[in-house]
Amino acid sequence: MPMEKTFDPAAIEAKWARLWESRGLFRPHRPDATPFTIVNPPPNVTGALHIGHALDNTLQDVLIRYERLRGKDALWVVGTDHAGIATQMVVERQLNERQQKRTDFTRDEFVDKVWEWKATSGGQITRQLRRLGCSMDWSREQFTMDPHFTRAVVKVFVDLHKKGLIYRDKRLVNWDPKLKTAISDLEVETHEVQGGFWHFKYPLADGVKLDDGHDHIVVATTRPETMLADMAVAVHPDDARYKSVIGKFVELPITGRRVPVVADEHADPELGSGAVKITPGHDFNDFEVGKRAGFKPAEMLNMFDGDANVIQTADGLIPAEYLGLHRFKRDGIDGARELVVQRMKETGFLIPHTDKDGNAHDAEPRTIQTPFGDRGGVVIEPWLTDQWYVDAEKLAQAPIQAVRDGRIQIVPKTWEKTFFNWMENIQPWCVSRQLWWGHRIPAWYAEDGRTFVAETEEEAQAEAGAGVILTRDPDVLDTWFSSALWPFATLGWPDDTELLKRHYPNDVLISGFDILFFWDARMAMQGMEFMGEVPWRTLYLHGLVRAPDGQKMSKSKGNVVDPIGLIDQYGADALRFFMCAMESQGRDIKMDDARLAGYRNFATKLWNAARFCEANGIAASTSLEAPAATLPVNRWIIGEVADTVAAVEAAFAAYRFDDAANAIYSFAWDRFCDWYLELIKPVLSQKPSPLQGRGLGEGDEAVPAPADGPLSPALSPEGEREIAETRAVAGWVLDQILVMLHPFMPFITEELWTGLGDRADYPLITAKWPAPNAARDAAASADIDWLIKLVSELRTAKAELGLPPGARLTAHFPASLKDRADKLAAQLDRLARLETISFDPAPAGASAQLVVEGETITIPLEGVIDIAAERERLTRALAAATKERDSLAGRLNNPSFVERAKPEAVEKARTDHAAKEAEADRLSAALARLG
């Protein structure tokens, strides 16, 4: 059946996604081949595909398809994360819509409802990954709450506890007062908030005074409410103003608490008064200062409950009027902050701020970087609480060494410094969460306070004794704890499965740099602890996908791009190719509709090239090796294929997705479609060149050959051989393009592969990567490269001189080019559109000079154009372009503009300057051609 005239991405995408999966072509099925394994970073089961997912999964699929074509036993592990907080919130919102809440149910009843939600609504993102063309092994789809995965999680927790690497401790956590749980740093977003900077007097106790005679220390704070739990005032040890009072005490207003003045380098002598209030129970920096000052976490004061309402501190010094107040003003009711400021003002301990107009205010206005929970949407409270922690410092040592000795390669290498800096200063990892949905912590408590950690309740009971009443820990594990086991638990661990033996370690992990520490590093820790080997040999970190103006995408900015919408508009192949072509190591990607449209056009061009081949009797190749060829154009294109294969392979080896994509793009569009198919048209049609008989070569007269079917009996044997050779080479080259392009654009390439040949039982996805055994033919390459340069120069000259592309001109060649011109007569006639080629000296007068590889070809212009008028037009245009170019250069050379203007304005000026500079150069060249 002939190919459709137009390319319809939607139709072929649905067809091939279904056929590939139904035929099991995504599964590893080559037991004797070298395995190649990637695990997909498990997206949240609640999630929808965002543009970052599209980039991440496209890069993985490109590698999987590439290695599959190279004959490896490729496994791409797919699955979803149970996403504790996110999933619990989704289900709670559904309950709220029915005027119900989570606490209306028992824990088990609520968890059952979450499982019901997953069964009906939890597969959106996996359906979207299929639309992107991801060739994951869907038959082994994983979920982090599956029974076998849960068994692995519990075993890891218990084993780490036995080794002393998991323990319970009192430390500060990011507490979300709305969700009432600790959250990870990744779930904290920092926003700029307009707030205040209050200055308070803290009286020195026991009659002590500063050297300047003052009886108080001035402290400044953005959180006045936390003074109710202050435990110290810190000053820099070298700050001469306070040396005499280090070790003395201040008596806090409101509470009357005596707190020491401590020396700590955290205090900055250049900032404010140089003294800072220390609240270890509600500030991460203060927590560390407090520990250095000798306070144990158990002694640190906590003034908030889980709702961020004021509670009494352990010393009982907070006045009753503050108890029960929220930390901030809420619903029109003053909070602890407002009341503290009011009391400090009333008692004379508030130092007002005077603005530039002389007006007094309680606080100095400040823009404050404030942490918010990304899901709860409220300000995070650093909160002192008992949680479970992993001794990350000990677990980090093996991955650090693995990166140092090269067992783990981080690409780009520039990320190694960041990796080492974080891992070498790693803090204990809080792994407990106050949720109902998730992996329940396998710990049970006896009434006497003893803790029993075991894989089952029966084991815990046996350890505690038959008569001991046990209560299970109500918390669940951090989602990152379970997903850290992904590289080996998905392969069957803790069972010693064949899949685990074959596919661990994984080969490569593709990850966004933003989860390097939350997921990647923790996988390395757990993998090396429990498997004794690195989880993957290469860690590739990509950047962000940004809005067209370079801003980070966010819902609040309204600049989020839906990848499914892009697939609907441009096709999955175009989106995938865009992601790869733009993926340059260490750089973010800017969305660009023009480029997306360009890659959609690339798919259309490939489709049309295949239609041309079909219409001209060019069929699928039957050989992996290049056909025998004698014609220079065929020998040239075979060499170009070999060079392109080598370039693509080198790019993949270096994880240069952009170089690989651009190499095949350049070859397919430029070399094959724009040049080769044009160059072989004279061969396929066998029309004698009108230049024959003018010294350009000999040849039998020929009649046009039919596009398909038997060759004309009037055609010479040599003509028949040339057509057959050219069809074979063209078919083989198109096959190599389809194979090389398949990892990037799987849908259109599979459709063309099957449509151009009887290969229904030999799909492209399982074909073989090109291995051309032909080297570049230097002579053929030199001839065709020269021809391409000549035609390009001639086309440029026509455009510059305002001549139509089809204008036939006379050209004077140097005698040294006669043999080459004879050999390429047919191609010169078709592509160069020359009326006459002469080897005599050019006549005097205006002419265009084309310099190709050091040889000058002259095109007389007398009688072709109005020389004087054209010179005048070009002179005016050049003056205008030069003026605008110089004006833009002046702006760009002005530091005031470059430093103060919006980045997008500066970038536009640079782009415009480059365009005007190129225009001026082009016009100058055109003037020079006129002589």
UniProtKB/Swiss-Prot annotation:
Q: Which residues form a coiled coil?
A: 864-930
**Record keywords: Nucleotide-binding included?**
yes
Enzyme class, first EC level, given as a word: ligase
> For this UniProt entry, what is the primary localization, expressed as one broad class?
cytoplasm
Q: Where is this region: Disordered?
A: 351-370, 691-717
Q: Where is this motif: 'KMSKS' region?
A: 552-556
> Which top-level group of life is the source organism from?
Bacteria
Q: Which GO terms describe its cellular component?
A: cytosol
UniProt GO molecular function = aminoacyl-tRNA deacylase activity; ATP binding; valine-tRNA ligase activity
Q: Subcellular location, in the record's words?
A: Cytoplasm
Which Pfam families does the record match to this protein? Anticodon_1, tRNA-synt_1, Val_tRNA-synt_C
| Assigned EC number | 6.1.1.9
Biological process terms from the Gene Ontology for this record are: valyl-tRNA aminoacylation
Describe the reaction catalysed, as an equation. Answer: tRNA(Val) + L-valine + ATP = L-valyl-tRNA(Val) + AMP + diphosphate
Compositionally biased tracts (Basic and acidic residues)? 353-365
Residues holding ATP: K555
Sorted alphabetically, which PANTHER family does this protein's record hold? VALINE--TRNA LIGASE, CHLOROPLASTIC_MITOCHONDRIAL 2, VALYL-TRNA SYNTHETASES
For this protein, the record's HAMAP family field holds:
Val_tRNA_synth_type1
* Free-text comment about domains: ValRS has two distinct active sites: one for aminoacylation and one for editing. The misactivated threonine is translocated from the active site to the editing site.
In terms of NCBIfam families, this protein maps to: PRK05729.1, valS
Q: What does this protein do?
A: Catalyzes the attachment of valine to tRNA(Val). As ValRS can inadvertently accommodate and process structurally similar amino acids such as threonine, to avoid such errors, it has a 'posttransfer' editing activity that hydrolyzes mischarged Thr-tRNA(Val) in a tRNA-dependent manner.
Q: How does it assemble?
A: Monomer.
Family stated for the protein in its record: Belongs to the class-I aminoacyl-tRNA synthetase family. ValS type 1 subfamily.
Instruction: Spell out the protein name for this chain.
Output: Valine--tRNA ligase
Which species does the entry assign this protein to? Sphingopyxis alaskensis (strain DSM 13593 / LMG 18877 / RB2256) (Sphingomonas alaskensis)
The organism that produces this protein has a lineage beginning with: Bacteria, Pseudomonadati, Pseudomonadota, Alphaproteobacteria, Sphingomonadales
